[in-house]
Amino acid sequence: MQNQKNQKSLVAKVLVLFAAVALMFVGVQVFADDKLDLNTLECKDALELTAADAADAEKVVKQWKVQNTSLNAKVTKDSVKVAVADNKVTVTPADGDAGKALSGSKILNLVGVCELNKLTLGTEKKLTLTVKDGKVDAEAGLKALKEAGAKVPATVNKDDVTFTVGKDDNANKVTVKAVDGKTTVSGQVVFEFTVAKTPWYKTVWFLTLVAVVVVAAVAGGVFFFVKKNKKNK
């Protein structure tokens, strides 16, 4: 009788052990199948990165998130590695444990060289610029281009272009030209522009009025203080 109980107990333990091993195997398979395939992830547009910047996984992931705000959290600067070639960047899982949650690869396009002669503006068709001493600040000019609907990638900065205002009959036109030797931008384009209106609180007459009021207030305060001291004496 006792032997039968021992045998039943042993059989039960063996069954439990087999069940545990089976569950463990299933768990491993589920985990293995739960890997995220990079190729299934979307990227709306080309990444606004230079080839040099695209060699940095952190910058690639950051730009990818700009194009795909719901990018899976498994994709991080540490979980992927990148390789750049032919104006494209290939994203693959990082080596070792860092990339074990990922599989496959994803090829992302880079914006490449911005060809200025291909830029177009929105419905306004004109830029709004602030001209000082016949010149336009490049940083402000790039901002005006983007506000007017021109698709200028983030790879183009104020050191890459110049804005030159025309003369005589072309005084209402500005030439945007790539600086020689730059790899992010090329060519040139001419746009019509209107001069930005100065806000009333920045006009000369308003600033002069404020200065006069401040001086008058200070002078009045000094006069009152001196007069009061004389009375006290």
Curated annotation (Swiss-Prot):
Organism phylogeny: Bacteria, Bacillati, Mycoplasmatota, Mollicutes, Acholeplasmatales
Signal peptide (UniProt feature, chain positions): 1-32
Domain of life: Bacteria
Membrane topology note: Single-pass membrane protein
Intracellular or extracellular location(s): Cell membrane
Transmembrane regions listed in the UniProt entry: 206-226
Any coiled-coil regions, as ranges: none
Originating gene: amp
Keywords: Cell membrane, Membrane, Signal, Transmembrane, Transmembrane helix
Gene Ontology cellular-component terms listed: plasma membrane
Protein name (record): Antigenic membrane protein
